[in-house]
Amino acid sequence: MSLLVVGLSHRSAPVSVLERATLTADAQVKLLQDTVAAEPATEAAVLATCNRIELYADVDKFHAGVAELSTLLAQHSGVGLEELTPYLYVHYEDRAVHHLFSVACGLDSMVVGEGQILGQIKDALATAQELHTAGRLLNDLFQQALRTGKRAHSETGIDRAGQSLVTFGLEQLSAGTAVEAWAKGKRALVIGAGSMSSLAAATLARAGVAEVVIANRTPDRAERLAQILTEGDDTDVLARAVPMDAVPAELTRADVAVSCTGATGLVLTAEAVAAAVEGRTGTPVAVREETPASAAGGLAPAGTDEGCPLDLSAVQGATGFSVMGEAAVAGMDAATLEQHAAWVDRGTVDRRDSRRTPEVEAELITALAATVAAGGRLPERRRPEPVVEAPRPAPALALLDLAMPRDIDAAVHRLLGVRLVDIESLAEASADAPMAADVDLVRRIVADEVAAFGAAQRAAHITPTVVALRTMAADVVANEIARLDGRLPGLDEKQRGEITQTVRRVVDKLLHAPTVRVKQLAAEPGGAGYADALRTLFDLDPETVAAVSRADDRDTSDSTENAKNRGRE
């Protein structure tokens, strides 16, 4: 086995790189074709999701394989090799198997334990089979990865730790409120009708939204999804389909929108979102910005700070207001001053420091020294009264962007009245998510399955050699029986049959123990050399061994094709 995987994912690359390194369906086909056409690779499969791109191949040379696969990924993803290389990871042989099995179990997902990846692995295998780029190794690998993932979900509680990306995103939008309570009665807009969008629509319907509107470039798919939602037994939701050009109008009615399309450009711009929520909160849509420093003194007016509970602009403009001595409290009662001090103390050091010039620091020190000289001690610092800040209003529109590259302009984050959760913010949130205790059990399952797969592959590697040995032994028996017929032409059929059976039994008994034992030894780590030893000891023709191996590959391919045909029926 010379399995190699080269890829990048949300764990190795920033979202800005991932969203540019996406592969369309056509690009995946071309990538697979170019990979098997390259010299080092004989098999290839690509696993491409919104959070990862991985190219699996059976290669005969490690270093040449890494170079070739990295170059092909760069060419077909549209990101230059120099820029892409720092974010690529490489796994080889058993480590590559361990990686895919971990991915299949959801251990490497952005949301640990999510089960959607199994469907994506199944699709990757189906594509490779359809293009005939998956041979025995990758067929066995991906099939066992699927079995491992299913075993992990059935034998452990990893599902309790794992959620779909949709569910996790909705939890982030609900901001601590139960999704069902948050979603109940809302109007939802789902942009796209693929697998992720369909899951989003179904999840929202089960959560209790009043209406789901599906917009898609292919009207039939949107209408079919709307029909499925309407006819579902577990939901009571109004669902309808609209064309993509109706999205701006529908967005003005929606309380929550989920977008996951394959578009290469933005589906929702910041301007479109701002227009959709204009007037919902009773005020024009504003942009969250840092208040710029005043040009005169380099300081923003005290009352203009975001979150400050007091407006000190009037006091600051009053005669006698300064930062020195008793004049500092002119026009301001003590409670007001301490409330403002409490707010300042809770602020960041950077903000406090940025508002102090050297002149201000000097005045403060002078004032403190004068107070100590007059009173003989430092003034006590009274505990300020807690400041009650007015709660911010709930956003008028909640947006969930699950596309890669992004569907919704990142500038929407800065719009007041709008809450946007995208892949980047999900990655940050998931980094702090607690791991379930069952994850350790899943890791043990992965380790067991990796060991079993390695043993099976090593045993399979020696099987053509054993078959060639038994074929050679059968040929020897046939030749010797033919020679016996020439020497003893008077033998009748019964005698000839008994002699033939006796010779075959002798040969089989002589070969049985060595061939069984050599398969056991070959299945152990480091057992790859036993096939070579067997070929050398019995002087087996390499071409005969290769012919047996090719025949096995054809049988595997035929079995796979028949299974696919039965699935279509």
Curated annotation (Swiss-Prot):
Swiss-Prot/TrEMBL GO biological process terms: protoporphyrinogen IX biosynthetic process from glutamate
Region of interest: Disordered: 546-569
Keyword terms: NADP, Oxidoreductase, Porphyrin biosynthesis
Pathway: Porphyrin-containing compound metabolism; protoporphyrin-IX biosynthesis; 5-aminolevulinate from L-glutamyl-tRNA(Glu): step 1/2
Biased composition (Basic and acidic residues): 550-569
Cysteines paired by S-S bonds: none
EC number annotated for this UniProt entry: 1.2.1.70
Region (Insert) residue spans: 284-397
Catalysis performed (reactions): (S)-4-amino-5-oxopentanoate + tRNA(Glu) + NADP(+) = L-glutamyl-tRNA(Glu) + NADPH + H(+)
The keyword NADP belongs to this UniProt entry's keyword annotation: yes
CDD domains for this protein: NAD_bind_Glutamyl_tRNA_reduct
Keyword Oxidoreductase among UniProt keywords: yes
Top-rank taxon: Bacteria
Site (Important for activity): 99
Enzyme class, first EC level, given as a word: oxidoreductase
Residues binding substrate, per UniProt: 49-52, 109, 114-116, 120
Annotated active site: 50
GO molecular function: glutamyl-tRNA reductase activity; NADP binding
Family: Belongs to the glutamyl-tRNA reductase family.
HAMAP family, sorted: Glu_tRNA_reductase
Subunit composition and interactions: Homodimer.
Further facts: During catalysis, the active site Cys acts as a nucleophile attacking the alpha-carbonyl group of tRNA-bound glutamate with the formation of a thioester intermediate between enzyme and glutamate, and the concomitant release of tRNA(Glu). The thioester intermediate is finally reduced by direct hydride transfer from NADPH, to form the product GSA.
This protein's domain notes: Possesses an unusual extended V-shaped dimeric structure with each monomer consisting of three distinct domains arranged along a curved 'spinal' alpha-helix. The N-terminal catalytic domain specifically recognizes the glutamate moiety of the substrate. The second domain is the NADPH-binding domain, and the third C-terminal domain is responsible for dimerization.
Protein role: Catalyzes the NADPH-dependent reduction of glutamyl-tRNA(Glu) to glutamate 1-semialdehyde (GSA).
Stated name of the protein: Glutamyl-tRNA reductase
Organism lineage string: Bacteria, Bacillati, Actinomycetota, Actinomycetes, Kitasatosporales
Gene responsible for this protein: hemA
